[in-house]
Amino acid sequence: MTLFIISIIVYLLSITLISTRALHMLQQNRYNRGYRYIKWIIKNIKETLLNYNLLFLVFIFTSITTNLNNISSIIFIVLLIFTDYVFINTRKKEHAKLPLKYTARIKRLMATNTILHLIPIIIMLITFNEESLSIYYLILGIMLILNHFITLLINFLNRPLEKMVGNHFRNKALNKLHSMTNMDVIGITGSYGKTSTKNVVHDILNIKYNVFKTPANYNTPFGLMITINEHLDKYNDYFIAEMGACKQGEIKELCDLVSPKYGIITRIGLAHLETFGSEEIIQHTKFELIESLPSDGIGVLNGDDEKQLSYNIKNDCKIIWIGIDNHKVDCYATDLELTYKGTKFKVKFKGDDKLHEFETKLLGRNNIYNILGGIALGKELGISLTDLQKAVKRVEPVEHRLSMTKYYDINLIDDAYNSNPMGCKMALEVLSMMPGKHMVVTPGMIEVGEKEYEVNKEFGRQIANSKTDEVILIGTEKTKPIYEGLIEEKYPESKIHVLNDVMDAFPLMMELKDKETYVLLENDLPDSFNEKIRSDKKW
C-alpha cells in the first residue's frame, strides 16, 4: 500500500505537468473553436500520443504478464520520474510566444480535470487490493498517455457551464454598451495587420477624441466582453474593437455584441486558412464586419487588395477606399521615402488637388496602409489635416511589428510577430532599402493551412531575389521549403545557415556582421529570441 501511495503522489505530479501543457495548447487553439485543438493534436501526434509515453506501453505489457506487484510499483514510479524529467527538459528548450494565462476559464477547466483524475484514484484507494495493482497501473498509465484527449473531454464537459458564464458576461456588456449612447464603436478585422491598425487608428483619433481600444490581442467574444465590462467608461467617445476569427460567422458574432458604426478591413489573405477551409470563406467572413454596419455607418477598405475590390458588398453604407498603387481610390499615398528613422509620404484625397505631406516613425508599406485607414476615418470624423499630420508623426511603432532596435552594433528590423506572406514580402522591401549588409533570420510561416509549403518556398524565392547577403533558418524541417526556394533561385548555399536552436543565431549574427549590418527578424520567432535581445542589447 505504501509504494502504491507513493506512486499516486508521483503520478499526480506527472498529470499536473502534462495537463498544464495540454491546457496551454487548448487555450492557444481557442478552446477548440473551429476544431483547432483537435487539428493540433493530429498535427502533433508524436508529442500527444507517442514519444516517451511509449515506455508506458512496455510497462503495461510487463505489469499484465507478471504478478510482481512491488516491482510493478517501482517500475511505475521510475517511469513516471523519467517522463517528468524528459518533459521538463523538453519544455525548457521550447519558448512559448504566449504563456498559459490562468484565466477564470482555465481555472474551471483545471478543477474539472482534477476531479476527473481523482475519481479513479479515490476508488482505487477505497477498494485497494494488491492483486489488482496491475489493473490500477494500467488505468493510470492509459490516462497519462491519453491526457490531451482527456483535456478535450473536460473542455466538452465544461461547455454548458462556459455558456452560462458567457451569457452572463454578454448581457452585462450589452447593458453597458446600451447605456453609453454618446460612444460609437469602430471594428477592425482582416487576415493580418489588425493589432497594428488598431494601435495606429487609436493614436490618430486620440489627438481630438477620447478613444479606448481593446488591449493586446483581445479579439474574441470573451476578450471584448472583458474589455467592455472592466475598462470602458462613460467618457470614451470611441471604442476600437479588434475582431479575430477562425471560422465563418465569428465576425458577425462580434458585431452582434458591439454593434460597430465604423469598420476597417486591413488585408485579406491566407491566415488561418486551415480552420476557415477556403479563401472564399475567409473573404466572406471578413466582410461580415462591413455588412453589419448601419446605413449611416462608414467602411474603410483597401483598394490595393483584389479580395476586397472583387467582393459584392451587401450594404448601402458609405465606403472609403484607400491605397498606394491604386490612384482611383478616395485616399492614396504616394512618393514614399523610407529611411532607418521611418517613412515620409504624401497623401492625395479625391476632390482635392493638393498633395499633403506626412511623416511617420513606422516602416514598410503595410504600416502606410494602416496609417491611411486612420487618416481616412479621422478626416470623416472631423479631424483637421494639420492635426492628422501631427498625430501620424507621433504614432509609435508596435513592438515586434517592423520596429527598429539594436543588438550590440547590429540594427534589427524586428518583425517577429508577423506570419503572413504579404507582410514577409513588405518586410524584405524595408530591409532592401537599408544600407550595409543584410541578413534574414526566420523559422518560416505557420497557420497557412495546405499552402504552408507553397508560401514558404515562395518566401525563399523572394529572399533570394532581394538584397539579402546571409540567411539564418531556424528549424530544419519547417524551413525546408524556404531552403528549396533559395536554392531554386541559385542563392549561394554557403550563405544559408540552418540552426536547430534559435539561441545559436546570436553568436552567428555577430560572426557574420559587417561594419553596418541590418538583420530582419521575420515570422513567429519565440519569446526567448526577444528576451535575448532585451537582455544583451547595447546602445
PLM regions: where:
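ATP-dependent carboxylate-amine ligase
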Residues: M1-L138, I142-R159, A376-L385, K390-W539
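N-terminal pre-Walker A segment at the start of P-loop NTPase domains
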Residues: I154-K172
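Walker A (P-loop) phosphate-binding motif
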Residues: N171-N217
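Buried hydrophobic packing segments
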Residues: V201, L205, L224-I228, I371-L381, ...
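Conserved substrate/cofactor phosphate-moiety recognition/catalytic segment
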Residues: I207-K234
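Membrane-embedded segments
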Residues: T220-P221, M225, K247-E253
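Switch II (G3) loop of P-loop NTPases
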Residues: N236-I251, L412-N418
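Acidic, Mg2+-coordinating active-site environments of NTP-dependent enzymes
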Residues: I265-L412, G436, R461-A464, T468-E470, ...
